[in-house]
């Protein structure tokens, strides 16, 4: 595939340039020898990690977008970080976070009523509460923990629709994500269509802003991360690639063209957390996704950041 060839060429160029520096040429004119060696070692490690992602793309016949931020060291891992992918249901954690930001804790307890006509495909929680309605807090939890699509739509409505959701992301510095549609149309993932797409870097940065920075108050951050820790749809994704004893809170997503995504906060024992976004797709509309791709990519990321 042309896509894979480009990635392989890029890796070859990367190694080639590093070889020049190893054999005597160095662009670090103003650095000490030790500084240059440190940068050289870091770049070589990055190339080796990228090669592993290239190999995963070949193994699973897929395209990957990866971005991770180690909060303690500020080290990042990036692979196709600025390429667009359909965000699919990963938006639900960001929409819930935006709803948390917009409303007081008391307001979250207000009951929202909806009708049978509002229900869309895959709404395992909201479909059980047509008669009683659900609180905004319960709706947010259903969207994150169970990826309930009607709950996702209600969150979007609370923000003023997809346009309002996009605006809420712009307020935290995200001018990349393009939100245009409701569930379930937003999962079409048509190649070249930028509607309802984002990048691994943008989604990871958004998640960091809502869960670890000061965008939300401490009590609201705790509510959000508790929902993520209880996600029922992510056991085979980033969580499966994490070392034993590392806690993961995530939000998964899936769509057409073999789209499979997961964005997460990972808490290693006794150290600062890691933010990870792994996005993927394949090349035909009815292609199936493989959860193992996300798990193996996560393993590469987290092993590199150990």
Swiss-Prot record:
Origin: domain of life: Bacteria
Binding-site residues for substrate, renumbered to this chain: 251-253
Entry-linked PROSITE patterns: BETA_LACTAMASE_A (PS00146)
Catalytic activity field: a beta-lactam + H2O = a substituted beta-amino acid
Other remarks in the entry: The class A beta-lactamase family has a specific amino-acid numbering system, sometimes called Ambler or ABL numbering and often misspelt as Amber. A multiple sequence alignment was used to derive a consensus sequence and then the consensus was numbered taking into account insertions and deletions. This allows use of identical numbers, e.g. for active site residues, despite differences in protein length. UniProt always uses natural numbering of residues, hence there appear to be differences in numbering between this entry and some papers.
Function: This protein is a beta-lactamase with a substrate specificity for penicillins.
Protein name (record): Beta-lactamase
